[in-house]
Amino acid sequence: MNTSHYSVLGHTVPYPKVYDPSLLFPISRAVGRTQIGIGVVLPFVGEDRWHAYELSWLDARGKPCVATATFHVPCDSPYLIESKSLKLYLNSFSAEVFNRAEALRLRIAADLSACAGAAVAVEFGLPPVGSGDKEISLDRLNVDIEDYGPPNPDYLSNVAQNLVEEMVEETLTSTLFKSNCPVTGQPDWASVTVRYFGMPIDHEGLLRYFISFRHHAEFHEQCVERIFQDVLQRCAPQCLAVEARYTRRGGLDINPLRTTSEMAWPLSVFRDPRQ
């Protein structure tokens, strides 16, 4: 079984000079999911949306071409794609000749699909930078914080029933999220958004919960699935979507999305301003 311990992550490796799809390194999703009580039947749908900013190849006359791209890895794929291996793989196209950009797109889609074990959609270009119209920022809350890890779901609760009578639909967001790479210890910064329909979730508790990831070491995708599970179990919304938009590293950023319903997908069609 592939694990991060055997990947290039955390190691100094030479940058490839020729195209090499074997650089891509899959990591089993099942390992991280078992730790948070997720079995074969997933409680969510969604994707890991990657934005690639450093993609270059040669045209038929040897002239360099550059582009950006978006990759959509389905969350029900058996494997996630390790980030440094993806960076090195994309760099390996820098001296590869393609007569048409479409041929490159198809090659990348085939290679990423083989690595993930499921069909990965690839398109050139990136979403625009922006934010949702009705997002409520939790960063404005005036709270004292003392707990920075491990993640503490005890902070999650609904507003007391004697204070509310009706279900609500809210989109709650925070730019204060930080977790850490489990291999290198490098900080991973993100904006996290929770959209739900149900009894009101306590805003201060949700912010405290987010900040309790600050010393936690876990892959991006697993952090989002942990948040989804904890909010679903502690607050019992009828519908739930969780998305994290991580800042760029190595010419890539990742945006995992997990939702109870494809009706809420995608949660956002924007990139975060910090991306």
UniProtKB/Swiss-Prot annotation:
Residues forming the catalytic site: 181, 188
Residues annotated to bind NADPH: 83-84, 249-250
Pathway given in the UniProt record: tRNA modification; tRNA-queuosine biosynthesis
GO cellular component terms listed in the entry, alphabetical order: cytoplasm
Top-level taxon: Bacteria
Signal peptide: none
EC number: 1.7.1.13
InterPro entries in the record: GTP-CH-I_C/QueF, NADPH_dep_7-cyano-7-deazaG_red, QueF, QueF_N, QueF_type2
Subcellular location: Cytoplasm
UniProtKB keywords: Cytoplasm, NADP, Oxidoreductase, Queuosine biosynthesis
Keyword Translocase assigned: no
GO biological process, one term: queuosine biosynthetic process
Keyword Oxidoreductase attached: yes
Chief site of localization: cytoplasm
Catalyses which reaction(s): 7-aminomethyl-7-carbaguanine + 2 NADP(+) = 7-cyano-7-deazaguanine + 2 NADPH + 3 H(+)
Any Pfam family: QueF_N
Binding of substrate, residues: 81-83, 220-221
Transmembrane residue ranges: none
Subunit structure: Homodimer.
Protein name: NADPH-dependent 7-cyano-7-deazaguanine reductase
